[in-house]
Design a protein with these regions (language model features):
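Sec-dependent bacterial lipoprotein signal peptides
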Residues: 1-25
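A Zn2+-metalloprotease active-site environment signal
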Residues: 2, 24-212
């Protein structure tokens, strides 16, 4: 007699999700409660892989800036911020801090991933004509996202959504499609925007970094 494959009970999956939600709480440097399901170290590993792929592609497209004056300016300002970050957050002393300068005058952007991997787009300077202090405030904000584990927070939101999709799929006997959707969500986790709470927190922390 043929038997159907055993699939997970939707109630068991729901229980796992609920336990994860209840136990996945941490406290940010400003005292804010964070929903985090992934360890900071795991977030750093994922971020490092994504960063190296991005930089490799930019290098192949000849989009990395090598102008000595620009490189020196960015290195001087980010270097000062990193030294303050390491002093105030000693665990970040083990990070592989680095910064890539992207030759893209149309893009006004900068970011810092978990683990201290940074990128700065030349549109920041060409379009905004930033002073050193203004640039320091922007990078202080971006570095604060990494210090406050905002990458892990974003990834956790995606993981929770993926788990919810899996529960729905199991309950509707469509687990294959559910897991495919969960995988897709996990893959785009690093590109999700930060929450408004995280942005406000980075504003506060970044201002402190930039003014020390």
């Amino acid at each position: 007699m043929l038997t159907s494959p055993v699939r997970p009970s939707p109630y068991r999956l729901l229980l796992i999700v609920l336990i994860s939600v209840l136990t996945g709480c941490a406290t940010s440097p400003t005292g804010r409660t964070q929903f985090i399901l992934i360890s900071p170290d795991a977030a750093i590993l994922e971020s490092e892989a994504a960063y190296l792929d991005t930089v490799r592609q930019l290098d192949e497209e000849d989009k990395l800036v090598s102008d000595p004056l620009t490189v020196a300016r960015v290195a001087r300002i980010t270097g000062r911020l990193v030294s303050i970050a390491v002093r105030d957050f000693p665990e970040s002393g083990d990070w592989k801090w680095s910064v890539a300068i992207v030759d893209d005058t149309e893009t006004v952007n900068a970011w810092c991933m978990a683990g201290g991997r940074m990128a700065v787009y030349t549109g920041l300077f060409d379009q905004l004509e930033l002073t050193d202090d203004e640039f320091a405030q922007i990078m202080g904000h971006e570095i604060s996202h990494a210090l406050a584990n905002h990458t892990a927070e974003r990834m956790s939101r995606a993981m929770a959504t993926a788990a919810g999709v899996a529960v729905i799929g199991a309950a509707s006997d469509n687990s294959g499609a559910a897991m495919a959707g969960a995988s897709l969500i996990a893959n785009v986790a690093l590109t999700l925007p930060n929450s408004s709470d995280a942005e406000n927190e980075a504003d506060v922390m970044g201002m402190v970094l930039a003014t020390k």
